[in-house]
Amino acid sequence: MPEDSNKASNTARVVFYTSILTGGILSSFYVYSRYFRRFTCTAEVPKKIYRGRTLFGRVTSVGDGDNFHFYHTPGGRLAGWGWLRPYPETNKRGLGKETLHIRLYGVDAPERPHFGRQGQPYGDEALEWLRSYILGRNVRVKLFSPDQYGRIVGGAKVWKLTGRKDVSTEMLKNGWGVKYEGKMGAEFNGKGKLFQKLEDHARKKKIGMFQQKGKIVTPGQYKKDE
């Protein structure tokens, strides 16, 4: 009888410690997948985290006036980024395969030359403004939806001396774009009216792309004529 009692006691201990170990493994996997898994392309981002999560990382390249490439650094400095693990170089060749392509929500910048077609006035200036504002900076991106080009429509926020700034909002304030006119993939995060007011104000002040004389063709109108 004592031997049977010892066996039962040992079995109970094994079950107890196995349960603890299993629970620890499952908890670790959950924490990793939610907070420390690094996403390298749109296809890797689970649909369930759109509109509910933000991602932190470094802007590694800006190729147009309303989109950029973003190197996801989950956990930020707490996970060693910037001191134990180096940030990637900006504009590094081949890094595109390791980054998320972010399309700024709610805005449209002047088109630059492509496919042999002449670009719009102030397209290069809009690109330079965005580069100077976020290239090489850490940003936090709220994910809204993937678009038809494999990008992620998202809202980016960056810290400046005067506080955290929404990049789409600042772009419109400075006149380097218009409120997004398309119907497909339109995202405003509840700021549609504000964005229209900011565009109208920039037009009135004739700043940014609105410095040009004569009729102003918006990016949406320009793309319709392609």
Swiss-Prot record:
TM helices/strands, residue ranges: 15-32
Membrane protein topology class: Single-pass membrane protein
Recorded GO MF terms: endonuclease activity; metal ion binding
EC id: 3.1.-.-
Classification via SUPFAM superfamilies: Staphylococcal nuclease
Compartments (UniProt record): Mitochondrion; Membrane
Residues at the catalytic site: 103, 111, 151
Domain of life: Eukaryota
Residues reported in the UniProt entry to bind Ca(2+): 108
Gene Ontology terms: cellular component: membrane; mitochondrion
Record bears the keyword Mitochondrion: yes
Domain TNase-like as annotated: residue spans: 53-212
Assigned keywords, A-Z: Calcium, Endonuclease, Hydrolase, Membrane, Metal-binding, Mitochondrion, Nuclease, Transmembrane, Transmembrane helix
Gene3D superfamilies: 2.40.50.90
Sequence similarity: Belongs to the LCL3 family.
Protein name per the record: Probable endonuclease LCL3
Organism ancestry: Eukaryota, Fungi, Dikarya, Ascomycota, Saccharomycotina
Gene that produces this protein: LCL3
